[in-house]
């Protein structure tokens, strides 16, 4: 992750049911390096200084934005207090501690403890 700046965008996931088509699209259109890691998951490397991401196989298409936060629990509570919903409580996945919330419109955000 290139950014550990509090409240800065650090990561993104591009979701869709046909990951191979997404790999081809982002490689060809933006010249991003796509590195498959296994079935349904590939790392995406963007130009220096930009957040890196991943292509993730999922039934529904979408983009998930990863935001670094200083206080994960407080940010999750603030999201709930302002109309968001918790999708995944703070969880250590072995790389980072993160939570997932939706904003009032239903957009999914990954909150990354920093």
Model regions and ranges:
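Conserved short beta-strand elements that form part of the metal-binding/catalytic scaffold
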Residues: 30-63, 108-114
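Residues at alpha-helix termini
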Residues: 28-30, 82
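Conserved catalytic-core motifs of GNAT/GCN5-like acyltransferases
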Residues: 11, 33-39, 89-91
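Conserved active-site tyrosine of GNAT-family acetyltransferases
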Residues: 22-26, 79, 106
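N-terminal beta-strand motif that seeds the catalytic metal site of vicinal oxygen chelate
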Residues: 1-23, 50-51, 63-67, 112-113
């Amino acid at each position: 992750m290139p950014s550990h700046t509090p409240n800065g965008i650090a990561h993104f996931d591009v979701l869709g049911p046909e990951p191979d088509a997404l790999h081809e699209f982002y490689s060809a259109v933006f010249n991003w390096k796509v590195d498959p890691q296994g079935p349904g998951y590939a790392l995406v490397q963007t130009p220096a200084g930009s957040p890196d991401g991943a292509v993730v196989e999922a039934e529904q298409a979408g983009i998930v934005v990863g935001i670094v936060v200083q206080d994960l629990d407080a940010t999750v509570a603030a999201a709930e207090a302002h109309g968001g919903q918790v999708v995944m409580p703070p969880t250590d996945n072995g790389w980072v501690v993160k939570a997932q919330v939706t904003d009032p419109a239903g957009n999914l955000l990954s909150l990354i403890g920093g």
